[in-house]
Design a protein with these regions (language model features):
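Non-cytosolic membrane-interface motifs at loop->transmembrane helix junctions
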Residues: 52-62, 122-131, 190-191
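Membrane-helix boundary/juxtamembrane motif in polytopic membrane proteins
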Residues: 128-132, 152-172
Length: 199
């Protein structure tokens, strides 16, 4: 998956999209690949009670929490840019839209001391914190909003080409949403567990 995402990111630089769209799609590919990498580290380190295992668990979770939210934000920006959204017309609005993701990043990295979003117990096992749900709520709101926006746009336009683009934007993230929901329900399952065969 990481190789495919990085390959798509590199190829997007040669596409017919605008420079902004190219940059956003490239960033999405690299961020998603990095997220999967750190999620794999969590899979390997969770339950390892050695100092190295616990440290790897802390770092991988803080980084993967942050990268997932950032990837959803980038997808939101990319999708809304493709749709010509008014939300991105001023720097002030862009900053406001970025603040929830910044909150997730701060909570993720301060959880080492506060345990608000997650913590690693003495056995080296990942546990959710009291404010864990902030991360999926923030991340999913970006994706759900832009997907619904694209779906509505697809119904409004008459151009078949634009309809196809908007429908792709509307349904592109559905598999990720389903997988993410599964991960929320079953807290011990990482994204890697959902994509790789296990014993």
């Amino acid at each position: 998956c990481m190789i495919i995402l990085i390959g798509l990111a590199v190829r997007s630089r040669r596409s017919l999209f605008s420079s902004t769209q190219q940059l956003l799609f490239s960033m999405l590919g690299y961020t998603s690949a990095a997220y999967i990498f750190f999620d794999m580290i969590w899979t390997l380190s969770d339950g390892v009670s050695t100092p190295v295992g616990i440290t790897a668990n802390w770092i991988s979770n803080a980084v993967s929490f942050s990268l997932f939210a950032i990837a959803c934000l980038i997808w939101f920006f990319y999708s809304e840019t493709m749709q010509g959204s008014r939300l991105l017309t001023t720097p002030y609005r862009v900053v406001l839209l970025t603040l929830p993701t910044a909150l997730v990043v701060v909570l993720a990295f301060t959880s080492y001391w506060t345990h608000t979003m997650f913590y690693i117990d003495t056995q080296g096992v990942y546990r959710r914190g009291a404010l864990y749900m902030i991360q999926p709520i923030v991340s999913y709101c970006y994706v759900i909003y832009t997907s619904l926006h694209a779906f509505i746009q697809a119904r409004k336009v008459e151009s078949l080409q634009k309809k196809a683009i908007y429908r792709t934007l509307a349904f592109f993230a559905v598999p990720a949403l389903v997988g993410g929901t599964f991960q929320i329900v079953y807290s011990a399952v990482s994204y890697t567990h959902l994509t790789l065969p296990t014993k």
